[in-house]
Amino acid sequence: MVLVSGLFTCAAVAADQNATPFKLGTFRDHGREFLGLVLEDTRVIDIAAANKAFERAHPQAPRVRPPAQMTELIARYEEDIGPRLRQLAAANAGAGSAGYVHAIASLDVLPPVRPAVILNAGANYPEHAQGIVEQAARAAAASGGAGGGPPGGPGGAARQAAVSKPGLWERSADDPRPDNPYLFLKSPSVMVGANDDVIVPRGREEIDWECEFAVVVGRTAKDVTVADAPNHVFGYSIEFDVSDRENRGDRKMGGGPDWFVQKNHDTFAPVGPFIVPKEFVPAPMNTRHYFTLNGEVKQDSNTNHMEYNIWEMLAYASNVMTLRPGDLISMGTPPGTNIEKQNPRWMKPGDLGVCVVEGVGEQRHHIVAQP
């Protein structure tokens, strides 16, 4: 049975019924980067240029300084940027030919934000975690060893019941979930855009997919409660958590997973294409996401299968480090990855991987060999 806290499933801020929905991104047009407001996934409004035109046409409107980067936009969203973006979206809702309106197909789509921190949830979909355990047991049985997964990992032979850890994660006495939340760091330096190539590193063959729903932090968060965590969410995006499943060739640190090697090759963190402000995502804990490889569905799940929900994971992360506007928390991957399979089919040069989160966006990646 998958447990998701029901207390906060309606915590997303309801959008004004009359508001024009929009998404946000960072784009490049002939070498010039700009922040864009995206309408209907097809048109991109240059925020700075549109704001200048709006203030010329409405001399009595408050003057709003355009943000220089997405982290600034996020930090100022509730102050002055959000109201102005809603005005710009409404003013450009109809088809128009203003010079600040671009067809998205004519632009380079960059990662929407440059976060200081990317956190990824591990084994947050129980079916995925169980698949890893079962495949580890099959592999161990075939080799005559003991199964149960890597030391300290899901299904470890010496696994004990999870206990409360004050200051880190405090469990209620009746919480039946077998583990506490689990997060690891991924370097922002390996982030690429939603349409960029994913590079298979030289000598590595076991390259896996993980299509994930990502949370964008909106306010500085440190030691926040689960109840207050929704107030620290700005919106939602996508991370394609590309993973190298090959070992490192030794038994250092007990032979357990090396997250640096597995998760941090160049291009292994595609993010975007957009960030959707939370008021336009009415049910973040009931959102379908799926992955296809060369048109074949490999993953197809829903955020309601998570073991720990968005707000629990944000609160947990804030117990360890200070989160700031624009930081990302990727919420883990559903079942269907190669690490769960007896006969894996790894990604290889020539493949096309597509990661979709409904209502948020789509990533399309050609898999290529390292030059």
What does each model-found stretch correspond to?
Residues 309-347:
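A conserved acidic, glycine/proline-rich C-terminal tail/linker
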Residues 16-34, 38-53, 266-273, 304, ...:
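Charged, cofactor-coupling segments
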Residues 188-191, 262, 300-308, 323-334:
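Short, basic/aromatic beta-hairpin or loop at an interaction surface
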Residues 11-15:
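Boundary at the C-terminal end of the N-terminal hydrophobic targeting segment
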Residues 16-27, 55, 59-297, 368-370:
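Active-site microenvironments in enzyme catalytic cores
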Residues 285-303, 317-325:
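Short beta-strand/loop turn elements enriched in aromatics
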Residues 1-9:
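Bacterial N-terminal signal peptides
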